[in-house]
Amino acid sequence: MIDGFNVRIYALCEVNDRLLVLHEPFMGKMVCKLPGGGLEFGEGPIDCLQRELKEELNLEICKYTPFYIQEHYVESLAKNNKQIVMLYFLVQLVEPEKINILDPQIASYRWISKDSDCPFDLPVDRIVFKKWQNLL
């Protein structure tokens, strides 16, 4: 039985029509994912975005736009009895060239173009990627 929520906030960091993706371990395998993480108590979604990008990659946001809200029920794969709620924001970075991996869990990063095959492993990330590809 579900007994709580895990709210996740993710950033679509776009520079020159390319999207920042991360590679990190998740449940025993390496996955491709977007930057972001869990909302902490007393924190708003934008505060979470700013904190996660600073903590993980030493990046700062200068502009953000809500992009996608998860539409269906998703149960957490990593946390027993928790429902995940995911919010995605399209963000502009202050100085994207200053990217520096600070989180030891992140193995690598890369920038992908809109015409790339979908690199994402997690189902909602795949939906978000397709929506991003269709932006003009």
PLM-predicted stretches and their roles:
Residues 1-34, 93:
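N-terminal strand-loop-strand
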Residues 3-5, 31, 79-85, 103-106:
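A generic structural micro-feature
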Residues 6, 14, 34, 46, ...:
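Short connector loops at helix/strand junctions that flank enzyme active sites
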Residues 20, 28, 73-75, 118:
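Flexible, glycine-rich phosphate/dinucleotide-binding loops
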Residues 22, 49, 53, 109:
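Hydrophobic pocket/interface hotspot
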Residues 34-68:
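The catalytic Nudix box helix
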Residues 72-98:
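Active-site-adjacent beta-strand/loop module that shapes the phosphate/pyrophosphate-binding cleft
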Residues 90, 100-132:
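NUDIX/MutT-family hydrolases
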